[in-house]
UniProtKB/Swiss-Prot annotation:
One of its GO terms (cellular component) is cytoplasm. One of its GO terms (biological process) is tRNA wobble position uridine thiolation. Keywords: ATP-binding, Cytoplasm, Disulfide bond, Nucleotide-binding, RNA-binding, Transferase, tRNA processing, tRNA-binding. SUPFAM superfamilies: Adenine nucleotide alpha hydrolases-like. Catalyzes the 2-thiolation of uridine at the wobble position (U34) of tRNA, leading to the formation of s(2)U34. This is tRNA-specific 2-thiouridylase MnmA. It is found in: Cytoplasm. The gene is mnmA. Residues 150-152 are annotated as: Interaction with tRNA. The active site is at C104 (nucleophile), C200 (cysteine persulfide intermediate). ATP binds at G13, L14, S15, G16, G17, V18, D19, S20, M39, G128. Residues 99-101 are annotated as: Interaction with target base in tRNA. It comes from the Bacteria. One of its GO terms (molecular function) is ATP binding.
Amino acid sequence: MPNFEQNQVIAVGLSGGVDSSVAALVLKEKGYEVIGLFMQNWETDSKDPFCTAEQDLSDAKAIADHIGIPLYVVNFSKAYWNHVFQHCLDEFAQGRTPNPDVWCNREIKFKSLLDHAKKLGATHLATGHYACIQNENNEYRLLKSNDSHKDQSYFLHLLNQYQLANSVFPIGGYQKSEVRAIAKKRGFINHAKKDSTGICFIGERKFKDFLNEFLLAQPGNIETPEGKIIGKHDGIMFYTVGQRKGLHIGGRPDAGEAPWYVVDKDVKRNVLIVVQGYEHPLLYSQELTCTNLHWIRDTEPSFPLTCKAKTRCRQADQTCVVTRLDNDHCHVQFEHPQRAITRGQSVVFYLGNECLGGGIIN
């Protein structure tokens, strides 16, 4: 984390979780004037048993009081609906699998929230992300966290130079275990609070039940690649490539005992295509194309580019060659076949520890 002048005001996005809480503590103990910001991105019934917003706000208030910083509650639900949620609905309707966290970081946390922090007099916005920022001759680089298991650079790959220049990741150099230990030592009520998982606006409720509230499901056939109908699906928007659960086609007398997996979606015919066996060759691909390209540095890399890539956040880095097709499309050729490459997800590129940027898988 860079050293700033001691009289600078830094706003911290306090989510009620342990990571942002320790991030605020680190800044406070370094002598900065710290203010907390709690985002409300989703309008929900206070009686909704699946929404943790009320508890999260309560935790954020308790932590702010504990550290001794003010906390402001800001509502970005309209911006979130317009710039994140509606985009996700459009993607689901087209049979793709979007990543809302990526869009939320670019459009809400490091845009709407950053702008609000500036209006309050803050010079920078800090969050509890596990990533690092390096200033190299006034060009900002996004680097992986020291904790490889918790690294979140994948979700931050759409950030631009302005956003990085005005952001701070105080715990990017910490291990998760260190963060929890600090929180416990300081008596934070959330030191053992579990990490949030799943899609943020769905919470712990069933994905299918939630989507049904916003999109009209169209049941259809489940077929093998050869066109044999072996079942019915509830709507292809509920499934993603590589998925095993929820197909309800096990125990067929004309097939072996190996489980079935989604391998593709035929949106035009409203057909879900499945194959049998985890290692089925159709689940693997050695190449992809991507669009909506974004490069973090002002100057994009030279092509063809030999680098590493991830097609999902927890995946190990995979060697590949990236070739520019046109202004907004790249071809990615992997050294080894990749399992369950999914349209709508992000492919993110790395050189060593640096996140270069990425695109959306076609």
